[in-house]
Amino acid sequence: LVGSEMCIRDRYMNEITSMWDSHWLTNMGPKHKELQANLCDYLGVDNIDLLTNGHMALELTLQAMNLQGEVITTPFTFASTTHAIVRNGLTPVFCDIDPDTYCMDASKIEKLITDRTCAIMPVHVYGNVCNIEEIERIAHKYELKVIYDAAHTFGETYKGKGIGSFGDASCFSFHATKVFNSIEGGAVCYKDK
C-alpha cells in the first residue's frame, strides 16, 4: 500500500499566512497571478485564466464564444463536458471513440457535421491525446471552433507543444482526482483574447 502525504505543514502555513497578511485572498491577488504565470510557463501557453473548477472552464469558454447549434463531443467523459454544452443552450452530438485510445474517433466526425454544427469538443482521455491534426483539419475545413477538454492531460505535450496550445481553447480541471490538483479549480488556455 502506498499512502498519500500532505504537504509540509510549515510551508503550507507560510503560504496561507502570506495570503492572509496581504488581505487579498481571491480575484487576481498575488498568489493567483503567480500561479497563472507559472502555469503559462509550465504548459507552454500564452493565455490562461483560472476558474473555480474544470466544469466552469468548459461552460464559460462556450459562453464566451457565443455559439449556437450543435457541438460534436464524446459520451466517454465525465458528465461536465455534456452539461457545459447543454447549459449553453447547445445540442451535444455524440461521436464514438477509438477503442485503443478512448478518445473521440476523428474518422467519424465528418459524417456527424450538419449545417447546425458550430464546434467540436474532444476529450483527451487517461493521458491519451486526441488525433489533434485530423480534428483541427476538419474544424478548419468546416470553420468550426475546437474546445479541448484536457482534464486528463495536464502537462502533456504533443509534437513539442503544450497540450493547452491546441484548438481555440483547452480546459483543465484541478480537482483532487486529477494529476495536478489544488483540491478544486480549473483553467482555460486560449489563443485569442
Where does each model-flagged region fall?
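Short, small-residue-biased leader/transition segments that mark boundaries at the very start
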Residues: 1-8
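Structured loop/turn residues at beta-strand edges in well-structured enzyme cores
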Residues: 2, 43, 66, 115, ...
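Phosphate-binding glycine-rich loop
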Residues: 28-70, 76, 83-88, 94-96, ...
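PLP-dependent aminotransferase-like
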Residues: 63-150, 157
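Conserved active-site segment immediately N-terminal to the catalytic lysine
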Residues: 148-182
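Short beta-strand-to-turn element immediately C-terminal to the catalytic PLP-Schiff-base lysine
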Residues: 172-173, 187-192
